[in-house]
């Protein structure tokens, strides 16, 4: 019971609980009198991050300007849910502007064009049709949705929303150009962009992906604690012992699966026996088969990422895939009096790039002045220290170490490192171990999420039954060959056919996805039959 309660307490400490958070200005008459003192931020960040930055920023504003400010956090879910909110709100806001302020007809062409990031506008507006005019008008307007900042999530959703026109340059780089020098915040590290070339979004802390491990659970299964590698998650001995999160609910989770694909593509390319295109195609297939094996071992696909380390720590699963923040946070929360923790986190060597969690000012921000102040604080050394300083250090968090790595290179030296919770994790020194190639999988990011849903999540029962049959019958070669058939989700199909499907209306996307899922259901059923029909004496590498 005590163990369960400690895990539950740790989970509550990390999870966002937005319905319990009441705006402070509802209880503070000083703030209620002045809406200009309220900053609205939409975020997927955890309650601990929101709490610590609220406390630190409010203190900063009191000390520097004598102002009482409040942050109203909006937490609809992960980045996927935030994107849906922004799409809905900006569509409604621009429709109102277009119809009621400009007096123009709202048509399907206008709706499809105004936020289309792939829409090509001519330089001159003389020959604009309604679609061109809508896109140009939106990009020149100050149409807002009552939110000032988008804070947290991976670089990809920020790039998408910048392309749509939702994000704008805050002007921070103009005021502080020295912060964006190579020696402080480089624009790119290991192939990952650290900020937008137009400064519409700026990375403020770093993230890597890795594996959280319960060594007691591995002992129970007779597995020696290995050097973490993505292939560990596909070990047949970990059947129903792997905790995964749903990539359709989070761009961050999708990014983790993208790391697996990129690592396999790099390994094949580095062999040197194939040209680049053939190597990428083979690496993609190998990566997809690894992802499906990991999916076959999955105990579940959680709707929120923080469940993964919580369940691994509790022994409900032996290992899990998670972002470094969750792994390190639970490692700290579950330490005993001697400093030992039943949860360990590690990033596979050469298995993950170092990417950023950005922040951006939204178009039409109602309180752009206060939003700028928050961003300025966030990128100052004082704000950056908050990410990984220990509780009790000067400039550190008040209640809980956030265990996130700051984006500023100039903090990874003394005297700052002495105060870090993770002083030995030096991301800029390890960046050359993995190079992210956006040209390889960047265009396939949406397809990766879509494919995993169609071949792992939707037919999960059939996938697990096939995998169990392979395990029970010692991986007969014909059944393994049938399992490894990824001809319906090749690299070429992902970049072509599936990418095209994802540009169509949601109904057509769903129809294609159901067909893909049904194909793999039948494939997994066939694998199960083949495995059970084998006498099990002939084995195959798996």
Spans of model-derived segments:
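A bilobed periplasmic-binding-protein/Venus flytrap-type ligand-binding module shared by bacterial periplasmic
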Residues: 212-217, 354-369, 386-387
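Periplasmic-binding protein-like
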Residues: 179, 184-187, 207, 244-245, 288-294, 377-402, ...
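Conserved C-terminal helix/tail region of periplasmic/extracytoplasmic solute-binding proteins
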Residues: 426-542
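Short loop->beta-strand "edge-of-pocket" segments that line small-molecule binding or catalytic clefts
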Residues: 40, 231-252, 260-267, 276-279
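A structural signal for short loop-to-beta-strand junctions that line the ligand-binding cleft
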Residues: 122-151, 163, 167-212, 231, ...
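Ligand-binding pocket segment of bilobal, Venus flytrap-like solute-binding proteins
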Residues: 130, 259, 263-339, 385-386
């Amino acid at each position: 019971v005590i163990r369960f309660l400690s895990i539950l307490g740790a989970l509550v400490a990390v999870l966002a609980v937005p319905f319990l958070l009441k705006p402070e200005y509802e209880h503070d008459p000083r703030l209620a009198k002045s809406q200009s003192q309220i900053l609205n931020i939409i975020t997927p960040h955890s309650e601990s991050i929101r709490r610590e930055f609220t406390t630190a920023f409010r203190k900063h504003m009191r000390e520097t300007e004598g102002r009482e400010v409040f942050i109203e956090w909006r937490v609809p879910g992960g980045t996927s849910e935030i994107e849906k909110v922004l799409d809905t709100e900006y569509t409604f806001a621009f429709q109102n502007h277009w119809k009621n302020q400009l007096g123009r007809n709202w048509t399907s062409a206008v709706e499809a064009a105004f936020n289309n990031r792939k829409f090509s506008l001519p330089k001159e507006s003389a020959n604009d049709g309604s679609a061109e005019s809508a896109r140009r008008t939106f990009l020149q307007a100050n149409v807002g949705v009552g939110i000032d900042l988008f804070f947290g999530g991976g670089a990809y959703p920020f790039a998408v929303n910048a392309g749509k026109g939702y994000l704008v340059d805050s002007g921070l780089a103009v005021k502080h150009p020295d912060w964006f020098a190579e020696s402080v915040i480089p624009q790119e590290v290991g192939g990952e962009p650290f900020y937008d070339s137009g400064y519409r979004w700026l990375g403020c802390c770093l993230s890597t992906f890795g594996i959280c491990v319960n060594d007691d659970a591995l002992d129970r299964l007779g597995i020696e604690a290995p050097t973490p590698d993505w292939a560990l998650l596909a070990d047949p001995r970990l059947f129903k012992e792997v905790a995964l999160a749903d990539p359709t609910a989070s761009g961050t989770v999708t990014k983790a699966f993208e790391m697996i694909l990129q690592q396999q593509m790099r390994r094949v390319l580095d062999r040197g026996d194939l040209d680049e295109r053939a190597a990428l195609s083979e690496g993609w297939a190998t990566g997809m088969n690894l992802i499906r094996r990991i999916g076959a071992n999955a105990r579940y696909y959680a709707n929120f990422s923080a469940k993964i380390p919580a369940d691994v720590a509790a022994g409900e699963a032996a290992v899990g895939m998670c972002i470094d923040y969750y792994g390190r946070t639970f490692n700290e929360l579950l330490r005993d009096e001697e400093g030992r923790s039943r949860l360990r986190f590690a990033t596979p060597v050469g298995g993950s790039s170092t990417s950023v969690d950005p922040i951006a000012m939204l178009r039409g921000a109602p309180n752009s002045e206060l939003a700028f102040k928050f961003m300025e604080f966030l990128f100052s050394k004082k704000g950056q220290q908050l990410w990984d300083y220990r509780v009790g250090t000067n400039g550190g968090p008040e209640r809980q170490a956030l265990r996130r790595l700051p984006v500023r290179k100039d903090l990874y030296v003394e005297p700052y490192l002495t105060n870090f919770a993770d002083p030995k994790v030096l991301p800029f020194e390890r960046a050359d171990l993995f190079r992210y190639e956006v040209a390889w999988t960047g265009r396939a990011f949406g397809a990766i999420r879509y494919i995993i849903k169609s071949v792992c999540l939707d037919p999960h029962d059939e996938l697990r039954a096939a995998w169990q049959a392979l395990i029970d019958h010692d991986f007969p070669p014909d059944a393994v060959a049938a399992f490894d058939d990824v001809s319906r989700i090749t690299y070429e199909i992902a970049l072509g056919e599936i990418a095209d499907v994802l540009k169509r209306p949601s109904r057509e996307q769903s129809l294609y996805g159901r067909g893909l899922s049904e194909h793999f259901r039948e494939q997994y059923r066939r694998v199960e039959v083949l495995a059970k029909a084998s006498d099990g004496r002939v084995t195959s590498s798996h």
